[in-house]
């Protein structure tokens, strides 16, 4: 077996480097996207159920009452399994929202009626600390129900420090 020439070695090195240049960024992009699945899908489930809830209730109680951050302590750099009663708040039950598997984000639901306009609004929030440094990421979706109209989710999602 003969040794590689400098030219052959350079060609192999260049091809290998090119493959890494393409594969590594794609890997990290997909890794980042997989970590964002939980808050995006969780909020989507929550707001979809909030809009369905509003369709069955009068204007002044279009959405269930506010629910605290659940779990109260945002998991720090790990996926945590919740205590059995963590999702027993009336709002989580009304929205059919809970986690039965370990997860990395905490969720909150706020609702309020504007007394001047009678517009009912909600904010669904997810907080996470994927790297465990104590700095939280925030994902937030808003919705409303204007008198005489069906409830709707407002366009867009607020995201702050998405991979924190």
What do these predicted ranges mean?
Residues 136-164:
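Low-complexity, S/T/G/P-rich flexible repeat/linker segments used as non-globular hinges
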Residues 1-31:
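N-terminal single-pass transmembrane signal-anchor helix
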